[in-house]
Amino acid sequence: MSIGSPRRSLAAAVAALPATFFIGASRAQSASESTLDRVTRTKQLRLAAVSGSPPYFKKDIATGQWSGAAIEMAKGIASVWGADLIFVETTYGNSVLDLQSNKIDIAFPLNPTPERALAIGFTKPFIVMPYGCLARPGFAPQSWADLNRPELRIAFDLGSLHETCARRFAPRAQLTGYESIQQCVLALQSGHADAEIIAAVIGLGMVGQNPSLGPYRLLGTPTVALPGCYGIQREPDTRFRDVVDAWIDFNRGIGTIREMMINGLALQGVTPDQVPASLTF
């Protein structure tokens, strides 16, 4: 028997193992250290950073510096451990996958949908955000019923909670989905839509940057408001989530989160008096 035969036999045996064996081993290895233990050891907190998403994220192309409400909140959380903030550029859609693959420790803002909760963990809400719309000149809707009319053309970005709201509360309208919020704005500006469904923080920021789109209109009857949370890795050790939850409770209580959000909106030209009272931080 040649020397190479046992090696070939071993290689064949390894090749015959199912792919799930390696996936399971990889997950077991990555799960051996909890988020809290890793942050404590490395003194680094990895944040999902989404460029071009004020008031939460804004990146200066010239300097590479980040600013925005999410940056300030993440710095505050990192300071609990005396840790440095590590920016991992991604998108809102990919941030869930990044948490699952242990590329990041925290991502926000994310709405805790049941589907997302199957894949990742969530902290307590740091914001409760009402929904409303931007409307064409001369059209001033006040309730969802005002949009739920067959002659009206309603725009929303596909796959978002804006779409969920439109289909649930304005099913009789002419509903059109677009790939991005920017395309919805273009439809509104060009007269191809009568209103665009959009969350308050995003809508306020858009009006701050381009006042001709305003005013932003909150819609009632019913009031639709959804929590915004921090997404975290799903793991049996809950100590990291417990610490972040405590940070949220404390900083909401003393008004720090509200101040951070107001400062983030100011990056888009939004003044405090433009922020509706039902938008709670």
Where are these regions (language model features)?
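Ligand-binding clefts/hinges and TM-proximal coupling segments of bilobed small-molecule sensing domains
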Residues: 30, 161-178, 215-218, 248-281
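Extracytoplasmic small-molecule ligand-binding "clamshell" domains
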Residues: 31-110, 118
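Periplasmic-binding protein-like
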Residues: 51, 128-138, 200, 208-248, ...
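Extended ligand-binding regions for polar small-molecule ligands
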Residues: 68-80, 139, 145, 151-153, ...
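A conserved helix-loop-strand patch within extracytoplasmic ligand-binding domains
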Residues: 83, 87, 91-93, 111-116, ...
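A ligand-binding cleft/hinge motif common to bilobed small-molecule-binding domains
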Residues: 94-97, 110-119, 165-168, 189, ...
